[in-house]
Structure formats: C-alpha cells, structure tokens
Amino acid sequence: MKRDYGGVGTIALRASALLKAMSQDIEDQRKEFNQTEYYQTFTRNAVAKLPKLSRRIVEQAIKEMEDDGYQFNKKQVGNVEQYALTIQNVIDIYAHRKIPKYRDIYKSPYVIFVVNLKGGVSKTVSTVTLAHALRVHQDLLRHDLRILVIDLDPQASSTMFLDHTHSIGSILETAAQAMLNDLDAETLRKEVIRPTIVPGVDVIPASIDDGFVASQWKELVEEHLPGQNQYEILRRNIIDRVADDYDFIFIDTGPHLDPFLLNGLAASDLLLTPTPPAQVDFHSTLKYLTRLPEMLEQLEEEGVEPRLSASIGFMSKMTGKRDHETSHSLAREVYASNILDSSLPRLDGFERCGESFDTVISANPQSYPGSAEALKKARTEAERFTKAVFDRIEFVRGEAA
C-alpha cells in the first residue's frame, strides 16, 4: 500500500502478530503438558466391551500379538505398568482377529459435502466433528476408517480446528493450489496433506489467498490446465489421486456460490445440509435448498455428470425452545425421509473448543478451558450424531449396491 489508509496497514500487522501469538501459546501449552498427541486410551476391560470382542478374545489377541513382537502402549500407575491401549492398538487387535475393514467392503472413498449458502450454521463444526468422530467412535473402530478433510474455504476454519499451525498467514500447499498445480499422488501425500492430532484423520489446508484463486478460477484453469473442465478439477486432481488412502473424504467450502462450491457439488456422493432453527437462518437455508437444482443444472450444462446419491438435512444449533421445535417440524415437512433423526445441538462445548483449536472429540478434558461435564455432554451428542450419519450412509450405499 502507498499509505496506511487510516490504520488499515497497522491493524493488519497487529492482527497478524496476535494470530501467531495465539497459535504459539496453544502449541507451547500442549508441549509443556505433553498433550501433542490424541489423549484417549483404553484399558483391556474397556476394549473387551467393544463390538465383536470379549475379555477372553482381547486377552488372547494381546498375548499372541506380543509373542510376535508387537508392543502395546502402557502407562505407569504407581509401581505397576498397565495397558493404555491407543486407537491404533485397538484397530490392530481387530486386524489380528481378521475383522473386515471398511475398505474391504467399499473400495472407493465416499465423498461428503457439508454445505449451505448461509454462514454461521455450524457447517465447519459439523465437518470437523464428523471427521474426528468417525475415526474414534467406539462402535466404528473395527472399520479402521481413514478420513480426509479438504478445506476450500479461504477463512480456513476447518484447518484451524484440525491443524492450527497452518491456519494463519499465507501458505502455498493448499487444496486450491494443489488443484491447479496438477500434482501427482506422491507429492500430494508428502507436501500437501497434513496429519491432525487424531491419527488417521488428515487435512488439506486452506489459506486466505485461496479467495483470489476462486475469483479467477476459469482463467487460471484455462492457463494451467487446458482442456480440463473447471468444475471437475477437485475430483480429478485430488480425490481420484488419493482415493486408495481414504474411506471418507469431506469437503468444506465458504458460504458463497463460487467455483469451489461447484467443484464440491460435482465431486460429492452425499450432501449434508445443516439447518439451524433460528428464523433468519432457517429461511436462508430454505432459499439455498430452492437454488440447489439450479446449481446442479449448471454443472450438467457444463458437461459435468454429478455423482450425488443422496441429499440429507439435519438440524444444527438446536435447543429445547418451542420455536426451535417448530422449525424442526417444518424441516421434516421439507426433507421428509431425507432428514436425520439426530441433530447437532447448541452446546457450550462445541463453542469453547475453538479456544484451543480443538473439536469436542480431540479436546483433552485436562486442558479444556470450560466445564469437563459440558465437554463430555457435547462429545456424547457428537458421537450420537456421527453414528446417525454413518448409519444413514450405510443405508444409502446399501440401496445403491
């Protein structure tokens, strides 16, 4: 800039410094209290209660695996060393028992787009919560679900929740840049895809600069990817190339109709529409639903054949208020059988997790800034919601088979 324009430049510098400081503070605290890894572990008795397992099965599997040289995670309790089985330990026990994994049943990943043109409807929170919860839900551990979140929202909110060190400033290895640069699978794995604190859940980050890419998308595709359809880039250049690595792939875009959202629609198998009950949000969601056929028609006119097999709505930010229940009833009229029985309620836990750049699944109760009971309640609701989504996906895929 030629000048400060009444403090614009100065404020930007301060904001950048504060963002970096906030991120560094969180990182320093995690390192200080040894919380840089996912916290949840299981006792042998807890694992024995999981589906398709029993105490005798678990004890026998552990013995056989240790005899073969496998090392289980343990912790010191006083003078005694006890098993503290990690998510991976449990998955390996299932594998030792030859329980089929999800990838043994379905060879290709299922692409899920949580989408709404209204901002502030819990779209990102729903996405990242589902991503983490699908991986660690106790009823789903036997499936060894591998999850990828592709963040195409320049606000990078999903990136903040899943990998906060890459959610500030400008970064080159974003989903938008990867789409344009036509990277091979190995380069995507090594340079673009980032792990999250929950092993088995990865993210491709977004950056504020991606907004400029979206605004010039058609011209950039013509320049860098001649001959490719501008609305099939996400599917062809990212999803298809890492398809063997994941069971579920989530897409997160901003709440505006742009080429990223249309790429998301073109690439998706399932649309999930968060539907808040507040009057203004509910009204805006209905307007989005009326526009959705036009967007799909636009893709068809551009030579794209959408892959959608289902469009499911669910209530977000629900409370027990009477007007919220009224909105829920109206939503049932609109979605009919295409609405989830489970909703994502408005709870303190979902909101406060952002203070430590966590989801309600990844947040460690020992360092969570709010009430441990509130976090537990939010996690319980998140797990119930996640199981409902998984069960609906199984129903949809079963019908299509």
Q: Where would I find each of the regions flagged by the language model?
A:
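Beta-strand-loop-alpha "switch" segments that mediate conformational coupling across diverse proteins
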Residues: 207, 317-364
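Phosphate-binding loop that captures ATP/GTP phosphates
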Residues: 139-149, 154-207
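Conserved catalytic-core segment of NTP-binding enzymes
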Residues: 5-13, 243-340
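Walker A/P-loop phosphate-binding motif and the immediately C-terminal alpha-helix
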Residues: 108-155
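Cytosolic-facing regulatory segments adjacent to core modules
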Residues: 185-198, 203-260
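Long, basic/Gly/Ser/Thr-rich N-terminal segments
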Residues: 1-104
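C-terminal boundary of histidine-terminating zinc-finger modules
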Residues: 353-379, 385
